A protein has these predicted regions:
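Residue-level marker for buried hydrophobic side chains located in beta-strands
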Residues: 30, 188-189
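PLP-dependent aminotransferase class I/II
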Residues: 211-291
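Active-site glycine-centered loops adjacent to acidic/histidine catalytic or metal-binding residues
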Residues: 191-193, 229
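A general structural signal for well-ordered alpha-helical segments in protein cores
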Residues: 43-44, 59, 67-72, 96, ...
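Hydrophobic "anchor" residues on beta-strands that sit immediately upstream
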Residues: 158, 187-188, 212-213
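N-terminal "arm"/small-domain region of PLP-dependent enzymes with the aminotransferase-like
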Residues: 1-65, 73, 155
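Conserved core of the PLP fold type I
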Residues: 57-183, 194-209
Length: 292
């Protein structure tokens, strides 16, 4: 008798752990979509301020996120409506996990598109929920009739839509996403992890549409190591989410560093613009290759 094996859930035993590649030094790593350099590289005065900030951070105290000023910075820079309440996660992954936990009733379903971010399906399985995956069209566009049909048939408690989609990089038509939100009887999460690289956002709808959650992260704009995601939604959702989020899920260093970084958002935007230009350049060079 193996006492440990006997108490672990059978469905978890057959899962595969997420593997982070162990790459040699100097290897160019692109799979995680990290910024290739420190966001303040070349700004010696800001790097010095950053170091001083870390020294002064009250790491002997538990963090008080609401009093840290981070919500105000997020609202001002990203235009989050006053009607929307904000929740922070230790990366967007944590928010995905707890939003799934929030609706994990018996026989509840999660709906997503395929292919998309793997953590949607993973968390559905983790909480014993059926995951309904709706395949994209061959050109990776959204098969809206199939999605609407799946919503009507399965009545999912939670729907995830990555906007733009990950890993395909395709951004669906806004009116298609709006149609999904209108058709849903449960919560719709519009995951804008890559929203900084697109011209459109559902953040202005946050708090206005009761069943909508708009989720973003600072990871893709140069701060993957800080592990901070944020979600904006109506009080009816966020009030319930607050009951299950850990009280100290953000740490003092991440809060201080994120707030400092957001105060210098002009530099961050310059970095984003540089990445956009590089994206266009690489695409143009790839199109010159006959074998692609």
């Amino acid at each position: 008798m193996n006492r440990v094996a006997d108490v672990i859930r059978d469905d978890i035993k057959v899962m595969t752990a997420y593997q982070v590649a162990d790459l040699p030094e100097g290897f160019i790593k692109l799979d995680a979509m990290e910024c290739p350099h420190h966001p303040f590289a070349g700004y010696e005065s800001l790097l010095s301020e950053w170091a001083d900030l870390a020294k002064q951070a009250p790491i002997h105290l538990y963090p008080h996120t609401a009093k840290s000023g981070i919500y105000e910075e997020l609202r001002e820079i990203f235009g989050i409506p006053d009607k929307a309440e904000i929740a922070l996660g230790n990366g967007s992954d944590e928010l995905i996990q707890f939003l799934t936990m929030l609706v994990a009733k018996p026989n509840a379903r999660v709906l997503g598109i395929e292919p998309s971010f793997v953590m949607y399906r993973h968390n559905a399985a983790l909480y014993g929920m059926e995951y309904v995956g709706v395949p994209l069209n061959p050109d990776f566009s959204l098969n809206l009739p199939a999605v609407l049909s799946a919503i009507e048939q399965h009545q999912p408690s939670l729907i995830f839509i990555a906007y733009p989609n990950n890993p395909t990089g395709v951004c669906f038509k806004r009116e298609e996403v709006e149609a999904v939100i209108r058709a849903a009887t449960g919560i719709v999460v519009v995951d804008e992890a890559y929203g900084a690289f697109h011209h459109d956002s559902f953040l202005p709808w946050a708090g206005e549409v009761e069943n909508l959650v708009v989720m973003r992260t600072i990871s893709k704009i140069g701060f993957a190591g800080l592990r901070m995601g944020y979600a904006a939604a109506s009080p009816s959702i966020m009030g319930e989410l607050a009951k299950i989020l850990p009280p100290y899920n953000m740490n003092q260093l991440s809060l201080a560093a994120a707030k400092f970084s957001l105060k210098h958002h002009q530099i961050i935007q310059q970095n984003i613009d540089t990445l956009k230009n590089e994206r266009s350049r690489v695409m143009n060079e790839l199109l010159k290759l006959n074998r692609l």
